[in-house]
Amino acid sequence: MRHPLLVDLDSGVMVPCNEDLGLELLTAADGVARFLWLPSERSINGHGVVHGGYIGATCDAAIGYALASRLENAEGFTTVSLSLTYHRPLRRETAEASAQVVRVGRRTAYVEATLRTEGRLVASAVSTLLIL
């Protein structure tokens, strides 16, 4: 049984918060997800770069879709922890978010993500998720 997140994509529907971010899903299969993202003007902070919260939300979205593609019984899940490391500022340019499931246990999962632009690492994230 496919996870509801992925079933909705088959009909062209994306979770509203991801739609608001402007994410374009490239793939979500076998524990891996990839998005393209062009940050909106509204995501730019007072320093002229993308606010870190938008970067975190984008990484979290990739993490969620990667895990959804790995779960076999359409279980729900929620983030327990999300740790971000910012490697360089992101201007308003297209970036690719990718996530890969590292481990799935009976009740928890561990997923890693990166955000890159033109091959350069912008941010990396690690997340622990509770399987409901």
Outline where the language-model segments fall.
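Terminal targeting signals and extreme-terminal segments of soluble enzymes
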Residues: 1-132
